[in-house]
Regions:
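Glycine-rich phosphate-binding active-site loops on the catalytic face of alpha/beta enzymes
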Residues: 1-5, 54-77
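Flexible, glycine/charged-enriched surface loops at secondary-structure junctions
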Residues: 33, 68, 93-103, 127, ...
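C-terminal helical cap(s) of enzyme catalytic domains, especially alpha/beta-barrels
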Residues: 16, 71-94
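Phosphate-interacting basic helix/loop segments used at nucleotide- and nucleic-acid interfaces
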Residues: 112-126, 186-196
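Conserved alpha/beta-domain cores
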Residues: 1-17, 22-26, 30-34, 40-51, ...
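Long, charged amphipathic helices and adjacent flexible linkers at domain junctions
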Residues: 25, 83-118
Length: 196
């Protein structure tokens, strides 16, 4: 990919891992892209190395893995998407416990609150974690922690809804703006029932 153009080939794996770790530490979405399953431009199956690279991006903590030429000019765009989805789903199902935990203490109140929310959800065995956000900040912070519980992020802002779709493990839902927590709680109940 792009790192391979800028760096010696042997440096790419560690630089990519370090970049992903740094982005997670600062709660920034990170997308691994370019030539992920490149052989699928002409072949219905990826190489083992490509499948491993895709899985390793997940295990390193990337929020998303993106295709480009494989689907825009490739002969097998649907197979490519299905293959990538299978690799990611299998890796998440069997290997998420290998994603390195964030060892640093939260640097902000928002970081401390989201970490506490994840810990409380685990201790209480909550069915899910819900957050309201206009900017997407709380959802972004929750995503970096890779919680075991599903996270639903409610927002009245459509651009924030779209932005949050980049965050790992976040299920964004659009709701009307509400000033009072009673209204917000009713929105959570209604939206969760609507979405199963």
């Amino acid at each position: 990919g792009d790192l391979g153009v800028e760096l010696p080939l042997e440096d790419v794996p560690l630089v990519q891992k370090n970049a992903i770790e740094l982005a997670r530490r600062w709660a920034k979405p990170v997308i691994v892209a370019t030539q992920v399953l490149e052989s699928m431009i002409d072949s219905p199956r990826p190489t083992r190395a490509e499948a491993s690279d895709c899985a390793n991006a997940v295990l390193d903590g990337a929020d998303a893995v993106m295709l480009s030429g494989e689907t825009s000019v490739g002969k097998y765009p649907i197979d490519t998407v299905k293959t990538m989805a299978r690799i990611i789903e299998s890796t998440e199902e069997h290997g998420l416990n290998r994603v390195p935990p964030l060892g640093s203490k939260p640097r902000t109140r928002g970081g401390a609150i989201t970490r506490a929310a994840v810990e409380i959800a685990d201790q209480l065995d909550a069915a899910c974690i819900c957050t309201f956000t206009q900017s997407g900040d709380s959802a972004r912070r929750l995503s970096r922690l890779r919680p075991k519980k599903p996270v639903f992020a409610f927002t009245p802002v459509e651009s924030t809804l779209n932005y949050m779709s980049l965050f790992w493990g976040i299920r964004p839902l659009l709701v009307e703006f509400a000033e009072h927590t009673d209204t917000m709680t009713a929105q959570v109940d209604r939206k969760l029932l609507e979405n199963g």
